[in-house]
Amino acid sequence: LTNTLSANTMAEDVTTMLAGELEFDPPADDYIGVVNVVGTIQEQTQSSVLDTSSGYQHNTTMDYIDNLMDDSDNKGILLYVDSPGGAVYESEELHDKLIEYKETTGRPIWTYMAHYAASGGYMTSVTGDKIYANKNTVTGSIGVIMSGYNMSGLYEKLGIRYVSITSGVNKDSSKLTDEQVAIYQSQVDECYQEFVNIVADGRDMSADQVKALADGRTYTAKQAKANGLIDEIATYQDVMNQMASELGVDEFYTPSSEESILAAIFSKAEKLVPKSEAQILKETAEEKESGVLMYYAEQLQ
């Protein structure tokens, strides 16, 4: 038992060292909290000691917003979005947390869109009382996607035979039937309607007005402004200056989130390790979130 506890404790310590920690140490005076949503909005997992998480950290971001809610010195949020979207679950959870912040505190959220604020990234953005975009921002992509890979040809080539024993005709979807396609389409449609409702509420538009724009396409900043999806086109510094002036608060706070030395070492080591064809296929499938409902904008390669 002692050895098991020691091993578990050591594993937890290693995980902490790899991940690094977010320090919430806000200024002593009034401040605006900067919330960075950069990268794909999804749960972060680690499959190995070399697999260090980077980019958007969902649980850390949610905890940070909770801390801002509880701090009376916080006077608002500047939401910095540079994201093509992500999983339905995490995108909506982040949206709802930001709405909770506004309703609980009565404090404002201003949104600034950087390179990308598409799909789930746009869903996050519409929590802003004011939405600004860089002149080169790509946004929109209001819609839902569920995708997967048909690996049957590859399995046959490799001599692999898939076998499943199920309790119902729709339990196994390895070979999609028309009925199963209809089932998944109904789930996509339900999430799409929720997305439309969120945009309608956030931008004070009717559902029909949103649907006219929500066929999955992306928009430039000028197109987004013309269609009422954003308020203004500006630089990040201009938005900071305007928000500071309007709220009468000069201090902007971003929590420290430095990558640990150990994480940096493992991250570099991972890039030097040759990958097998199986690992490449696995990473490709994970990147596409196979079989998961996504508010995500595909980017041209």
Q: Which residue ranges define each predicted feature?
A:
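N-terminal organellar transit peptides
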Residues: L1-W110, Y116-A117, K130-Y132, G148-Q301
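Short amphipathic alpha-helical segments
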Residues: E92, T124, V144
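Short, conserved loop-to-beta-strand elements that form functional interface hotspots
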Residues: S119-G121
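Hydrophobic/aromatic ligand-binding patch that stacks against planar heteroaromatic rings
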Residues: M123-T124, L154
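Hydrophobic/aromatic residues within transmembrane alpha-helices
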Residues: T124-S125, A224
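Zinc-dependent metallopeptidase catalytic helix centered on the HExxH motif
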Residues: T127-M146
